[in-house]
Amino acid sequence: MTRPKPVVLCILDGWGISSRPEQSAPDQARTPNFDRLMRGCPHGTLVTFGPDVGLPKGQMGNSEVGHTNIGAGRVVAMDLGQIDLAIEDGSFYENAALGEFIRKLKASGGTAHLMGVVSDGGVHGHIQHVIAAARAVTDKGVPVVIHVVTDGRDVPPQSAMGFVTELLGELPEAARIGTVVGRYYAMDRDNRWERVARAYAAMVRAEGLPAPDAAQAVADAYARGETDEFIQPTVVEGYAGAKDGDGFFCLNFRADRAREILAAIGQPDFSAFDTGRRPEWAALLGMVDYSTSHDEYMQAAYPKRQVVNTLGAWVAARGLRQFRLAETEKYPHVTFFLNGGKETPEEGEDRFMPASPKVATYDLAPEMAAPEVSAKLVEAIEAGYDLIVVNYANPDMVGHTGSLPAAIRACEAVDKGLGMMLEALEKAGGAAVVIADHGNCETTIDPETGGPHTAHTTNPVPVIVFGGPEGAKLRNGRLADVAPTVLDLMGLDLPPEMTGTSLIGRA
């Protein structure tokens, strides 16, 4: 057959397959274009969690893990498992960068400020990493203040009290909790600097709502009607803020939602909001590399391992043109993560990132920037790129709110975009691989509590090939098989590093 051009990799972020259609937004939504694909095209399912994507057994996937594996075309061992193993075998406590951090604080006489998401969700961080770091630092005689970031998004919306109680029970004597802050404020990634400013004010200047202890901070938030994600920055009695000679250690291992708060804390030329006089930090440490700019003022306990010969790099090496498209909420995913942790575009790689709407939560604007993404996708198809990667954020971002009516509207907005894409591809003679990176909006009710379900799932996700070889069949697989499938459609061989295999079987 004639090689299709362009080939579109269309990622429906958070669109899983549920066995309970009554609570599934994709099942309840009117999606004629997705339905057309499922009726008329080869399709299968993908595994997006656990060892199939480089995570511990049973651990749900997420967008970072998903896009990393998609772009790599191989199973990539993720940071969660690496850090868990280091804590288990004791090597974490001998980590060179952590040792240097401790030495600098012993020399300055300062306090170590530890910030991390306190839950067992395992998407951005883990409570056990916070506990291990507190022990490692206090064992060497350095006092610790912990800045608790409450989750409620990758775990049930009102589970923080249990995690705070667990943390308090495990902390060494020389460690205490200084602040309690919902991730809505501390872990923004879309330039909502007014939120980040409030988290910064609490952690660094001890300015926020008062509470006698961390458990009461959570209880007070619940009394105000706030769930864990949205707990307003709260300062625990006795915490007076950071001072010159202190150090700051971010325990989150996922980059995208750590970058903004860390820039406010340490970036020399930071100007997004007025931080006032910042402490002269003796040391700044991250669990991982957060970006090349962060590397200029922070060390990393576990530096990123470069993934070579990704989908984008291989296409670029063949002299072909590619286009990356997503609204700003998913900007890092189709660029940094898909390119194996590389910030800069590949040769011949163009990008367009329309702004996500500035609303408090995305159930208030479930269409998000999908209309603009869809219009730009049609333009890119008509422009003659060889490869286009597009991410629709709606199913995931709206799914995180737990609102089924809003998630239905989100899926319908994405389906309109699918219709526009299919029409443009038919005119251009192109093809598409339509997938999801993990599930979310297909489960809106928590089966255990009966309340809203806001986390990712371990459900299978769809994979569909449009415009592929005549009579082709599709087998089931995992995310590592996506890049080989795309390269197969493009008529390209695989780099030796790609151990995934094409899902396309020919008659």
Curated annotation (Swiss-Prot):
E.C. numbers: 5.4.2.12
Species assigned in the record: Paracoccus denitrificans (strain Pd 1222)
Family to which this protein belongs: Belongs to the BPG-independent phosphoglycerate mutase family.
Catalytic activity: (2R)-2-phosphoglycerate = (2R)-3-phosphoglycerate
Pathway where it operates: Carbohydrate degradation; glycolysis; pyruvate from D-glyceraldehyde 3-phosphate: step 3/5
Record-level Gene Ontology MF annotations: manganese ion binding; phosphoglycerate mutase activity
Oligomer and partners: Monomer.
Keyword Metal-binding in record: yes
Active site (UniProt): 63
Cofactor(s) listed: Mn(2+)
Function: Catalyzes the interconversion of 2-phosphoglycerate and 3-phosphoglycerate.
UniProt binding sites for substrate: 124, 153-154, 183, 189, 254-257, 330
Binding-site list for Mn(2+) 1: 396, 400, 456
Entry note: cofactor: Binds 2 manganese ions per subunit.
Gene designation per UniProt: gpmI
Keywords (A to Z) from UniProt: Glycolysis, Isomerase, Manganese, Metal-binding
One cellular component (GO) term of this entry: cytosol
A Gene Ontology BP annotation from the UniProt entry: glucose catabolic process
Principal EC category: isomerase
SUPFAM superfamilies: 2,3-Bisphosphoglycerate-independent phosphoglycerate mutase, substrate-binding domain, Alkaline phosphatase-like
CDD domains listed in its UniProt record: iPGM
UniProt binding sites for Mn(2+) 2: 13, 63, 437-438
NCBIfam families (alphabetical): pgm_bpd_ind
Transmembrane parts of this sequence: none
The protein's name in its UniProt record: 2,3-bisphosphoglycerate-independent phosphoglycerate mutase
